């Protein structure tokens, strides 16, 4: 717990916290995050941080949320960037941003489903692409679906958010993604953003 608070202080109070000590040791900051959060959240913060404090040696361990928590328990990292699991106690959390889980697909996929299965509800006919059961995003969405008595008939599990996005873009099914991350990725390729794509809010 002490190391986590010290790491947060290092980020927030950089000019006061990061100094060479009397033995001139190089300051170190050990971070843990999933590959998705590293790509879509951490990198932009690190770019500015490194520019301000180029003398800090930073290491990043890309792991799942629960593996990141384990590294914190073992004091192998100082700070973890994670999606907060429900009912988790014993850690100090500093909120960074709110995310919205969203189902996304191409307009063509929806049209094809209506042609192929005109009498079936989309929930029963479509293929829904989700992260694996151990993922925090998947667990959160599962809880929301259960609360609304929604049961998906056809689920394709995928290991990474990037693959979910790519599969949705080629019309393989309806992907459950983090909305802002999807829009960032789409925006880099197309200034028109979500043109030709349909969103279904899940949160």
Q: What annotation goes with each model-predicted range?
A:
Residues 1-20:
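Alpha-helical "hinge/linker" immediately C-terminal to small N-terminal DNA-binding modules
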Residues 23, 90-129:
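Flexible hinge/capping segments at coil-to-helix
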Residues 26-89, 158:
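Central regulatory/effector-binding core of bacterial HTH transcription factors
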Residues 46-52, 120, 138-151:
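Ligand-binding cleft/hinge of the Venus flytrap
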Residues 69, 73, 93, 117-120, ...:
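Short hydrophobic/charged patches on amphipathic alpha-helices used for structural packing
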Residues 79-84, 106, 131-132:
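Short beta-strand elements of ligand-binding domains
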Residues 88-95, 99, 163-203:
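Beta-alpha-beta core module
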Residues 111-114, 126-148:
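Secondary-structure junction motif
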């Amino acid at each position: 717990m002490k190391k986590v608070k010290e790491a947060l202080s290092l980020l927030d109070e950089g000019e006061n916290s990061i100094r060479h000590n009397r033995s001139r040791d190089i300051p170190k900051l050990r971070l843990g995050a999933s590959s998705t959060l590293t790509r879509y959240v951490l990198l932009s913060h690190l770019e500015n941080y490194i520019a301000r404090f180029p003398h800090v040696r930073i290491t990043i361990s890309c792991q799942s949320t629960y593996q990141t928590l384990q590294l914190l328990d073992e004091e192998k990292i100082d700070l973890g960037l994670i999606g907060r699991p429900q009912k988790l106690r014993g850690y100090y959390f500093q909120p960074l941003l709110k995310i919205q889980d969203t189902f996304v697909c191409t307009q063509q996929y929806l049209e094809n489903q209506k042609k192929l299965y005109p009498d079936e509800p989309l929930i029963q006919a479509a293929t829904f692409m989700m992260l694996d059961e151990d993922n925090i995003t998947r667990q959160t969405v599962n809880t929301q679906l259960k609360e609304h008595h929604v049961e998906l008939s056809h689920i394709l599990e995928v290991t990474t958010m990037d693959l979910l996005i790519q599969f949705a873009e080629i019309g393989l099914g309806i992907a459950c993604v983090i909305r802002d991350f999807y829009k960032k990725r789409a925006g880099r390729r197309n200034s028109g953003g979500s043109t030709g794509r349909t969103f279904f809010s899940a949160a």
